[in-house]
Amino acid sequence: MKGPCEVQKNEDQEGEAAATGPQAETLEAERSWTADSHSALEAEGTHGLGERVMATLYLKSCRANSVVPVSCLLRQEGASELNLRHRGLGPQGVRALASVLTSNPYIKRLDLRDNGLCGAGAEALADVLRKNSIISDVDLSENQIGAAGLQAICTALALNPTVEKMQLQGNRLEEQAAQHLAALLLHHRGLKSLDLSYNQLNDLAGEILGPAVAENTGLTELNLSWNHLRGLGATAFARGLEANIFLKVLDISHNGFGDSGASAIGDALRVNNVLEELNMRNNRISVSGALKLGLGLQVNQTLRILIISKNPIRSDGCVGLLKSVRNNKSSALELLDVSDIQVSRECEDLASSMSEILPGLCIKRYTSRRKDWPQASTPSQPASAPSDSGL
């Protein structure tokens, strides 16, 4: 079965006959916009004139690329955000869009999620990001941009410090993309937030990204949830966290860090004095990994939120984490999420007692009780709807 990017290539080769429909719609859109713009131009003066020039340029580019214009772009009237998600633009549509985005002085946030950009569309947009000094927030999620498209985007961002937030969820990025991401982390000091969730970054990617995270000097929020980080790659990435002095929010949930990765995270927490929020939900961490993670919690003074729910750490692991926090007089922890973990009464009692010792700490727990325990001790939340928490 062909993917959207392969289908797009075939559609681009169908010839002029297939372009007749879009051409006609483009001309109709241009006539409609021209009629509406005259009165607006009289009211807006030179500001309206600038927008009219850009709109005219966009319409011409749409005709040249045989695509139907996006009406909301023609009527944006200096809006700071352009939301075109789920529009099916494809590479040709983005090429037409690039003509106006390059010199647009208004748009700060660009949302192109789920538009089938593929590599060619990403390359066209990269030229925009290279030249535009206004756009600071970009969402390119679910576009299958691939390694080649990512390389073009990362190269452009390295030359433009204006972009502070980039979302690249669900682009099927694999280990080949890791080297481009590492280069981005090393050379783009203006980037503050990067979302790489729902991709296919694996062990090798973790080994490449770890040193880059250690050297990064700007990123404050990183989302790597729902990837394939495990084994040596997860450990290498965790070690990179030790030297990082900027990252405040890290989401590595739904990976496979396991006990070795949890141990490395624990080591990082012993020396890292910047990280504030950490999500390790569903990472195959057992009792051993939880206890080693706890060693970091015994001395860490900055972590405010730790989510370790849905890991098989059992009661012993939960008790170990709770005792580590209790024994740290300088702990900044405000939320410890150990929900969806089967625990004993000892763990429940310890968690309850800690509310008196550390009133500022919220311990989130949904406890799957053993059948032979009294019904009266069953928590109020039903077993059929366990709590699901994320950063």
Curated annotation (Swiss-Prot):
The keyword Lyase does not apply. It holds the Pfam family LRR_6. SMART domains: LRR_RI. This is Leucine-rich repeat-containing protein 74B. Coiled coil: none annotated. Residues 1-38, 371-391 are annotated as: Disordered. The gene is Lrrc74b. Keywords: Leucine-rich repeat, Repeat. Residues 374-391 have a biased composition (Low complexity). SUPFAM superfamilies: RNI-like. It comes from Mus musculus (Mouse). LRR repeats lie at residues 106-126, 134-154, 162-182, 190-211, 218-239, 246-259, 274-294, 302-323, 332-354. Residues 28-38 have a biased composition (Basic and acidic residues). The keyword Repeat applies.
